[in-house]
């Protein structure tokens, strides 16, 4: 988030070229620096989860390091009994939003490949509340695959430099067939294992349950699309 004026100049040039060839295209930054990205050619920027920042305060607020699995989870604002306030988030979010909302969208994400899944510290009901909040705040919400069904974070050994992030990169869980429907290969041939523990959420199970997290997410997104403001 430092001043990177030359990087910004490059992206403004790319934006100019893109507008000529693909005027309908949108550019999305993974910067978490809306004051730079949205004023230099990007339409959107992710509000990334950085340990200790405002977004982390809302959804995770854990302890840990790159080479260790997260611990002391359960301190986030959306954890029912955490006692954590919302001020740290508001103090970070509001000034940046007010400074950039006319330039583009600073977007909430449920997770990404570099972040522990929100289900690591939030119950299903807490996830419903968290999603209801970030899906109705300004910006365009991004749902990381599997978060719509509450896929669990798996504390796996690091794989090719994944470190603690490895546990958020496991295969999508579609149904209750082999490998949860992700692949017909033998389980030991998968790049990362599927969640084999009892109660592993699947799309098939949640589609059939009107009270599932998946159907809550669908309802929230439908609500968002029918309420422009």
Regions found by a protein language model. Name each.
Residues 1-5:
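Aromatic- and acidic-residue-enriched carbohydrate-binding clefts of CAZyme catalytic domains
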Residues 96-101:
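Short, conserved catalytic or adaptor-binding loops enriched in Gly and charged residues
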Residues 15, 19-21, 26, 33, ...:
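Loop/helix patches that line or flank the sugar-binding groove of alpha-linked glycan CAZymes
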Residues 7-11, 127:
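Amphipathic alpha-helical segments in well-structured domains
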């Amino acid at each position: 988030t430092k001043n990177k004026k030359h990087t910004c100049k490059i992206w403004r040039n790319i934006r100019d070229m893109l507008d000529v060839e693909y005027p309908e295209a949108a550019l999305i930054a993974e910067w978490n620096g809306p004051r730079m990205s949205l004023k230099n050619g990007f339409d959107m920027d992710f509000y990334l989860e950085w340990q200790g920042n405002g977004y982390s305060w809302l959804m995770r607020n854990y302890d840990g390091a790159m080479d260790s699995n997260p611990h002391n989870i359960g301190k986030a604002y959306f954890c029912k009994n955490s006692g954590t306030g919302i001020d740290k988030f508001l103090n970070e979010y509001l000034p940046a939003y007010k400074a950039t909302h006319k330039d583009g969208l600073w977007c909430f994400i449920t997770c990404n490949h570099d972040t522990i899944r929100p289900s690591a510290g939030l119950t299903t009901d807490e996830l419903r509340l968290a999603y209801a909040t970030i899906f109705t705040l300004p910006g365009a919400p991004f749902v990381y695959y599997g978060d719509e069904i509450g896929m669990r974070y798996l504390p796996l050994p690091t794989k090719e430099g994944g470190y603690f992030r490895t546990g958020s990169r496991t295969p999508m869980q579609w149904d209750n067939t082999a490998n949860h429907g992700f692949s017909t290969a033998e389980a030991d041939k998968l790049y990362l294992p599927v969640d084999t523990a009892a109660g592993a959420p699947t799309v098939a199970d949640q589609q059939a349950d009107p009270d599932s997290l998946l159907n809550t997410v669908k309802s929230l997104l439908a609500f968002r699309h029918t309420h422009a403001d």
